[in-house]
Swiss-Prot record:
Biological-process GO terms, alphabetical: antigen processing and presentation of exogenous peptide antigen via MHC class I; antigen processing and presentation of exogenous peptide antigen via MHC class II; cellular response to low-density lipoprotein particle stimulus; defense response to bacterium; Fc receptor mediated stimulatory signaling pathway; Fc-gamma receptor signaling pathway; immunoglobulin mediated immune response; innate immune response
UniProt source species: Bos taurus
Gene: FCER1G
Record flagged with keyword Disulfide bond: yes
Protein name: High affinity immunoglobulin epsilon receptor subunit gamma
Modified residues (Phosphothreonine): 77
InterPro entries reported in the protein's UniProt record: CD3_zeta/IgE_Fc_rcpt_gamma, FCER1G, Phos_immunorcpt_sig_ITAM
Keyword Phosphoprotein in annotation: yes
Subcellular location per the Swiss-Prot or TrEMBL entry: Cell membrane
GO cellular component, one term: external side of plasma membrane
Superkingdom per UniProt: Eukaryota
Function: Adapter protein containing an immunoreceptor tyrosine-based activation motif (ITAM) that transduces activation signals from various immunoreceptors. As a component of the high-affinity immunoglobulin E (IgE) receptor, mediates allergic inflammatory signaling in mast cells. As a constitutive component of interleukin-3 receptor complex, selectively mediates interleukin 4/IL4 production by basophils priming T-cells toward effector T-helper 2 subset. Associates with pattern recognition receptors CLEC4D and CLEC4E to form a functional signaling complex in myeloid cells.
Assembly and binders: IgE Fc receptor is a tetramer of an alpha chain, a beta chain, and two disulfide linked gamma chains. Associates with FCGR1A; forms a functional signaling complex. The signaling subunit of immunoglobulin gamma (IgG) Fc receptor complex. As a homodimer or a heterodimer of CD247 and FCER1G, associates with the ligand binding subunit FCGR3A to form a functional receptor complex. Associates with CLEC6A. Interacts with CLEC4E. Interacts (via ITAM domain) with SYK (via SH2 domains); activates SYK, enabling integrin-mediated activation of neutrophils and macrophages.
Regions of this protein lying in the Extracellular compartment: 19-23
Annotated keywords: Cell membrane, Disulfide bond, IgE-binding protein, Immunity, Innate immunity, Membrane, Phosphoprotein, Receptor, Signal, Transmembrane, Transmembrane helix
């Protein structure tokens, strides 16, 4: 039932307004094309920044190679003595 109604509406409707003015379509296509280029450039720039940050963090790991863990406990237990009575 629904596909028949849609087909009937498509046959009764006149030419679409967008098809009557191709210059408008060309302008919108150009805007979308430029938008896609800008987004692609921003995405590539972001990927390069992440890659540079990852290599920089790998190089700085050499600072911590000489450190060892502490042998003394951070918190020591207190020896509580009872007062003499």
């Amino acid at each position: 039932m629904i596909p028949a109604v849609v087909l009937l509406l498509l046959l009764l409707v006149e030419q679409a307004a967008a098809l009557g003015e191709p210059q408008l379509c060309y302008i919108l296509d150009a805007i979308l094309f430029l938008y896609g280029i800008v987004l692609t450039l921003l995405y590539c720039r972001l990927k390069l920044q992440v890659r540079k940050a990852a290599t920089a963090s790998e190089k700085s790991d050499g600072i911590y190679t000489g450190l060892s863990t502490r042998t003394q406990e951070t918190y020591e237990t207190l020896k509580h003595e009872k007062p003499p009575q």
